[in-house]
Amino acid sequence: MTLFPIFADLTGRRVLVVGGGAVAVRKTQALLQAGAEVVVGAPRLDPALAALAEQGGIARLDGGFEPAWLAGAWLVVAATDDRAVNAAVSEAARARRVFCNVVDDAELSSFQVPSVVDRSPLIVAISSSGVAPVLARRLRERIESLFDHSLGQLAALAARYRPRIRAARPDLGQRRRFYDWLLDGPVAARLRQQQPGLAEQELEQALRAPQAAPRGSVVLVGAGPGDPGLLTLKALRALNEADIILYDRLVSEGVLALARRDAERVPVGKLPGKGHDATQARIHALMLAQARAGRRVVRLKGGDAFIFGRGGEELEYLRAHGVPYEVVPGITAALACAAYAGMPLTHRDHAQSVRMVTAHCRADQDTLDWAGLARDQQTLAFYMGVGQLDYVTARLLEHGRAPATPFALIENGSRPEQRVVTGTLADLPEIARRRGVRPPALLVIGEVAALADTLQWFGQHQRGLPGPQALAA
């Protein structure tokens, strides 16, 4: 360890910033956030610094650097683009035993400013000892993705209740388990949901119940269409905090690979024609049993849980049984598959609206407004439609949709094996059969589908019926 990590209390303490440009602006703003009394010395000031000086937010020293500027300073930051000036600041600071940071110059610095993840009062600092600042910034970005912004509120709440927690849990082992519950349980969940009052109620109840059984929870997470890079930061955090993951058939291996290594994984996917209602009842029972056992359950669904994902039914069940829950949206197939096919769902010249439709309705029910769906100047996105292509095509043509309307079938959208098959509505079922389209596939119908022929950028693209050679193969 070449540098000793230290956090300095600069509240009300004089810090000198030498330089008046953009770098000096950033350093000054950071120091002001830490409560420092900032003095900026430079011949000219950036407008932002000049405004701060006029408002009394900082003091100003005009002209070129002079060692006398260091009088009373606890720290100095040299932020000029002139190495000779920076060296003079460094030498003067060394002579007066004042710590000096020269921006982007480790050789002239006696301290380094780390990359910071700020969840005040929790602060995470990352330093490369001045050797590789880019690496430190990259690590900061990754750490930022792991910590919800409510973590600072949680740290402040824990600090405020620390004496009471110590009194209620005098045994060290009990206290550690209580803090684990505090960090991972319903209190943290309430803060993530922007409900600080309810968070404090949860904490008060736990303190009044000396040995309360652990209380589990469920997070309903949308996994997106398959590309793990489309997972949201909040979804990633949920996967890394899960004790058990109940995942659907269409969740990709790449997404599951991002989950906590020791989390239990239970597949609960539904297969076509295999009794969905019975499977859904099993999912409900599993969520309830695992949550009541005190476990953190992630219910992981392909796409978005609230777009043809039966997420609403699952929340109703959890609410009826008193299980706390959260919802993390995912990128639904219509948005992701269209984007990966290079196909805008709306376009000023072609479509002023989008309709997401399930082609997999409840048995013996078809309540769709086919006359409305057949209108032009709109885009239709059919989910779960591969087995219903003949029916969908017939109904749209019957209600007046033009036979020449373009379509696109996006198979395995956003995954390495993605394939886009395009053509016109009249030939849709035949093209799909001859091309061997298989689920999962999203069907897009509308003028925008033709743009996939020219704007496609990812995976394979096949247009129309296969030629004789392809048929022979």
Swiss-Prot record:
It catalyses: uroporphyrinogen III + 2 S-adenosyl-L-methionine = precorrin-2 + 2 S-adenosyl-L-homocysteine + H(+); precorrin-2 + NAD(+) = sirohydrochlorin + NADH + 2 H(+); siroheme + 2 H(+) = sirohydrochlorin + Fe(2+). InterPro entries: 4pyrrol_Mease, 4pyrrol_Methylase_sf, 4pyrrole_Mease_sub1, 4pyrrole_Mease_sub2, CobA/CysG_C, NAD(P)-bd_dom_sf, Siro_Cobalamin_biosynth, Sirohaem_synt_dimer_dom_sf. It comes from Bordetella pertussis (strain Tohama I / ATCC BAA-589 / NCTC 13251). In the N-terminal section; belongs to the precorrin-2 dehydrogenase / sirohydrochlorin ferrochelatase family. It comes from the Bacteria. SUPFAM superfamilies: NAD(P)-binding Rossmann-fold domains, Siroheme synthase middle domains-like, Tetrapyrrole methylase. NCBIfam families: cobA_cysG_Cterm (TIGR01469), cysG_Nterm (TIGR01470), PRK06136.1 (NF004790), PRK10637.1 (NF007922). Pathway: Cofactor biosynthesis; adenosylcobalamin biosynthesis; precorrin-2 from uroporphyrinogen III: step 1/1; Cofactor biosynthesis; adenosylcobalamin biosynthesis; sirohydrochlorin from precorrin-2: step 1/1; Porphyrin-containing compound metabolism; siroheme biosynthesis; precorrin-2 from uroporphyrinogen III: step 1/1; Porphyrin-containing compound metabolism; siroheme biosynthesis; siroheme from sirohydrochlorin: step 1/1. Residues 1-203 are annotated as: Precorrin-2 dehydrogenase /sirohydrochlorin ferrochelatase. The gene is cysG. This is Siroheme synthase. Signal peptide: none annotated.
